[in-house]
């Protein structure tokens, strides 16, 4: 009988990014278990014996949200966590309207591996942690990564305009690197649980002081690890849309070979020192001027654009991501602001934006079973013609055995109730009430939002780009 010193279990549930139950999704495919993975999936993964294909499975709202239990073991607690991290990294579920807590587990496991797997979290840990991720996403939403890259390339081209050869080379590199840098960065900015995983895994690769990022590890190598962390590396058995593209992989391999050759020639050197040497116009011992010029240009080419990844630790520094930490006694230090109920509710809406209400209606916040009253025989929350205040209860929606009371987002008067029967199945975004609000909605002008986001992006970019250009100069 095999006996292991440690084990860890993750419960895979049908939930959204805020861990609220999310019913109605359908599992169309699920990756096979990998070596060392113990998966109790209630038979969901049994394939059709005749075709060998996965049988679609719909997650009905009338049942518990649990999908599977994932267990890994190891010779110690850290090894079991590392095995679980690899299981979560390589687990792929796909299907229409499907949402699970897979990424939540992946981010959390990376956080514990970075901060201490022997930490002793209490039941008060998860909601503040999710609130912190809401803060991360709120700040990330104010950055346009594509605009930042294009702006950065224009700065490089302006710096190279004195030389036709340098201008041409810079243009080619910018074209080559747009997808190499942009695809993983876009995922990290859009998906807060993955951003948490990245920040945790790379917390020793950088320092953030006074709004400035200093890389302690070669950011080009961090980029390689980022593809691995996101399961977008060349070894991933996935369609092209979900893995690194061939031309990008070739560039990574060339860069890896270049820095390995540099290390052989110059020896192991801390990255800040090595970066300064490679940017210096003075060749070190063992290199002639012509050869060193080629080395220096290659280094600048491989590093071009990687400063964009400095945006991520800057976001973390601004919201205080690393203030959530494990103490010497293994308790967890949680900033007080993350316990504020109103703030928690706001950040939950950032993680999972509620469906947009029209000015004259209120829609269902999620799919599930609709109830107009607290219990049979009790009065309905609202009647037609009744005035309600912001924060008044309007209805209850049951999702996977969880009864959630929904409150009015604004004050107004109910003109018509559109769902008449208790127990009616409603879908997310379905109109439930026709109303007349006390105050008319004013939606943000998309043009103004675009200008605001680009302005914020430029402020971030000035900090990361100026550091790089000043160092090159």
List the predicted regions and their residue ranges.
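A residue-level detector for short acidic-glycine micro-motifs
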Residues: 372, 398-401, 416-421
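Catalytic cores of soluble metabolic enzymes centered on carboxylation/carboxyl-transfer
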Residues: 1-340, 348, 423-473
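Short hydrophobic beta/alpha edge segments that flank linear recognition/processing sites
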Residues: 383-407, 423-443
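Acidic, low-complexity mobile loops and tails
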Residues: 326-396, 405, 411
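Residue-level recognition of beta-strand microenvironments
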Residues: 73, 373, 417-418, 435
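A generic structural motif
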Residues: 15, 156, 367, 392, ...
């Amino acid at each position: 009988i095999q006996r292991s010193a440690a084990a860890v279990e993750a419960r895979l549930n049908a939930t959204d990014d805020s861990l609220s139950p999310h019913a109605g999704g359908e599992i169309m495919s699920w990756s096979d278990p990998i070596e060392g993975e113990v998966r109790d999936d209630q038979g969901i993964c049994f394939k059709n014996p005749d075709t060998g294909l996965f049988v679609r499975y719909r997650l009905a709202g009338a049942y518990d949200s649990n999908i599977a239990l994932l267990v890994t073991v190891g010779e110690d607690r850290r090894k079991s966590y590392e095995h679980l991290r690899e299981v979560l990294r390589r687990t792929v579920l796909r299907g229409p309207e499907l949402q699970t807590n897979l990424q939540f587990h992946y981010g959390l496991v990376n956080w514990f591996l970075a901060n201490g797997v022997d930490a002793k979290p209490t039941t008060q840990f998860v909601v503040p942690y999710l609130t912190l991720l809401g803060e991360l996403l709120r700040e990330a939403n104010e950055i346009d990564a594509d605009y930042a890259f294009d702006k950065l390339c224009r700065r490089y081209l302006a710096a190279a305009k004195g030389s036709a050869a340098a201008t041409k080379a810079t243009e080619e590199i910018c074209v080559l690197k747009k997808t190499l840098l942009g695809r993983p960065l876009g995922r990290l900015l859009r998906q807060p649980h993955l951003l948490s995983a990245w920040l945790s895994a790379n917390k020793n690769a950088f320092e953030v002081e006074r709004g400035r990022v200093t890389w302690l590890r070669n950011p080009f190598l961090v980029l390689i690890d980022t593809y691995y962390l996101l399961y977008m590396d060349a070894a991933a058995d996935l369609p092209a849309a979900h893995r690194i593209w061939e031309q990008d992989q070739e560039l990574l391999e060339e860069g890896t070979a270049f820095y390995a050759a540099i290390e052989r020639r110059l020896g192991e050197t801390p990255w800040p020192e090595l970066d300064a040497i490679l940017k210096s116009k003075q060749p070190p011992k063992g290199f002639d001027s012509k050869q060193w010029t080629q080395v220096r240009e290659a280094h600048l080419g491989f590093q071009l654009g990687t400063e964009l990844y400095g945006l991520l630790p800057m976001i973390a520094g601004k919201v205080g991501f690393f203030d959530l930490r494990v103490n010497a006694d293994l308790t967890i230090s949680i900033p007080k602001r993350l316990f504020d109920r109103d703030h928690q509710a706001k950040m939950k809406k950032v993680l999972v934006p509620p469906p947009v209400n029209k000015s004259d209606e209120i829609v269902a916040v999620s799919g599930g079973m609709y109830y107009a009253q607290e219990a049979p025989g009790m009065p309905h929350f609202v009647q037609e013609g009744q005035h309600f205040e912001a924060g008044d209860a309007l209805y209850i929606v049951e999702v996977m055995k969880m009864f959630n009371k929904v409150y009015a987002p604004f004050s107004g008067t109910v003109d018509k109730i559109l769902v008449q029967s208790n127990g009616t199945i409603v879908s997310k975004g379905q109109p439930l009430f026709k109303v007349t609000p006390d105050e008319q909605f004013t939606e943000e002008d998309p043009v103004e939002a675009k200008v605001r986001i680009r302005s914020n992006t430029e402020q971030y970019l000035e900090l990361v780009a100026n550091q790089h250009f000043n160092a090159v100069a």
